[in-house]
């Protein structure tokens, strides 16, 4: 199989290089080392042909294998004895283009591999054997081979390039390759076609992708496919590292935009999204401004500031409500206590009062299990009577020291039931009978 492919790719009937065959041979050699060895043997055989075109195509195929596969091919070239064959062709003063191509290939390869101290010094030896023999050609400036690895050029890309080249045939390939165009011009035209097709696909509604089938869009897709082939050819043949790097990147972008068009035609893209796809294009209808790192940081800071501000306001409001509840609680509790006392029956006054409640009151269990007023510190216990005087006014009889006023008070209030006041006022003082602080709040004002 390998020998047949090499024979077909180096046929003397070809008017120009069959890039489709060359790419297929590169893939075959990269997959299988045995096939790679057979390919090199077949190339060596074709180098012995008397037809200069066959020799030139064989040298170009060998150059492509060296640049894209690398070490394995170099080993096979040395083991198979291809280098002495190349040196012999140059010394024989055969066709000039073949001799020059071989000489430049040996020069570039031995330089890239490190010369005499490199991994394959055989290339250095073969090159300087020609130099010592007086062979000399006009060398290209900075002529170094560009190694395009399998990672840089995906295999599916090579397959698609192969399929397109097969469909177009040798005549189309010959016509395109015969045009000597600078790498910058090729890259510029391919970039222009890419941008135009991108804008057209951005305007296509993914829910109704009929716009992807019109004649104008299909022409753009065909143009991008053509430019993709030219870019791929540039990757394979150019020795300008910068141009090759740009061409590889542009080839990937062209492949993505073509895949996107196929997705639209097949209906795999159903919902428009504002997210950016892996190829850097937005799938929604409106252009989306890319967000830089600075914008993201500013938006994050603003979001954090808003969150902190709202949290701070919420905490302030919550604390304010709690303070208002604490301020209103004693007054409301006192009113509830008085209301409960007014409903209490006389016989309830003689019953033992609970330790933390009031007899006959309608206070909830939670209120019964908490003190009426928080206990005061020890140094403020003596001022408890004064603070209690600030509560709502209560009619209190004069102290026993003022006996005359006390008797007069009881006589005046004897008929209106005020004598029962001391009993009903139990639990409203901060001090017990012995003057100590108490949480029960039960005290008798009578003597």
Curated annotation (Swiss-Prot):
Its main location: cytoplasm. Residues 322-331 have a biased composition (Acidic residues). SMART domains: VHS. Residues 9-138 form the VHS domain. Residues 178-266 form the GAT domain. It is a peripheral membrane protein. The modification N-acetylalanine is found at residue 2. Gene3D superfamilies: 1.20.58.160, 1.25.40.90. Residues 272-282, 303-314 have a biased composition (Polar residues). CDD domains: GAT_GGA-like_plant, VHS. InterPro entries: ENTH_VHS, GAT_dom, GAT_sf, TOL_plant, VHS_dom. Keywords: Acetylation, Cytoplasm, Membrane, Protein transport, Transport. It is found in: Cytoplasm; Membrane. Residues 437-447 have a biased composition (Low complexity). Belongs to the TOM1 family. Might contribute to the loading of the ESCRT machinery. This is TOM1-like protein 5.
């Amino acid at each position: 199989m390998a020998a047949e492919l090499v024979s077909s790719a180096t046929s003397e009937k070809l008017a120009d290089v069959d890039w489709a065959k060359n790419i297929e041979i590169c893939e075959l050699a990269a997959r299988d080392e045995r096939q790679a060895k057979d390919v090199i043997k077949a190339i060596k055989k074709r180098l012995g042909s008397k037809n200069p075109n066959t020799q030139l195509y064989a040298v170009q195929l060998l150059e492509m294998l060296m640049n894209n596969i690398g070490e394995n091919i170099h080993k096979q070239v040395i083991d198979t004895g291809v280098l002495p064959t190349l040196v012999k062709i140059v010394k024989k003063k055969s066709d000039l283009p073949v001799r020059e191509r071989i000489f430049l290939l040996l020069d570039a390869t031995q330089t890239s591999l490190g010369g005499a101290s490199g991994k394959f010094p055989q290339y250095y030896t073969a090159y300087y054997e020609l130099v010592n023999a007086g062979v000399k050609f006009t060398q290209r400036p900075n002529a170094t081979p560009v190694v395009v690895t399998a990672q840089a050029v995906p295999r599916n890309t090579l397959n698609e390039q192969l399929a397109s080249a097969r469909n177009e045939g040798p005549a189309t390939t010959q016509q395109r390759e015969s045009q000597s165009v600078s790498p910058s011009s090729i890259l510029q035209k391919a970039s222009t076609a890419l941008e135009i097709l991108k804008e057209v696909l951005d305007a296509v509604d993914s829910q109704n992708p009929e716009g992807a089938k019109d004649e104008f869009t299909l022409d753009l897709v065909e143009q991008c496919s053509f430019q993709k082939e030219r870019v791929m050819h540039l990757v394979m043949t150019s020795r300008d590292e910068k141009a090759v790097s740009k061409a590889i990147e542009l080839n990937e972008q062209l492949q993505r935009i073509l895949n996107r068009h196929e997705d639209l035609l097949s209906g795999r893209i159903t919902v428009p999204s504002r997210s950016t796809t892996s190829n850097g294009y937005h799938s929604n209808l409106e252009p989306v401004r890319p967000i830089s790192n600075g914008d993201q940081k500013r938006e994050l800071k603003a979001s954090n500031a808003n969150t902190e501000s709202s949290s701070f306001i919420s905490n302030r409001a919550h604390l304010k409500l709690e303070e208002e509840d604490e301020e209103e609680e004693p007054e409301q509790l006192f009113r509830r206590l008085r209301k409960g006392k007014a409903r209490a029956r006389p016989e309830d006054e003689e019953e033992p009062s609970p330790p933390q409640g009031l007899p006959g009151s309608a206070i909830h269990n939670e209120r019964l299990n908490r003190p009426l007023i928080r206990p005061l510190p020890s140094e403020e216990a003596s001022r408890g009577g004064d603070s209690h005087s600030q509560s709502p006014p209560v009619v209190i009889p004069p102290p026993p020291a003022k006996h005359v006023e006390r008797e007069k008070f009881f006589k005046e209030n004897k008929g209106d039931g005020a004598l029962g006041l001391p009993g009903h006022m139990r639990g409203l003082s901060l001090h017990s009978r012995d003057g100590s602080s108490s949480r029960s709040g039960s005290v008798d004002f009578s003597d």
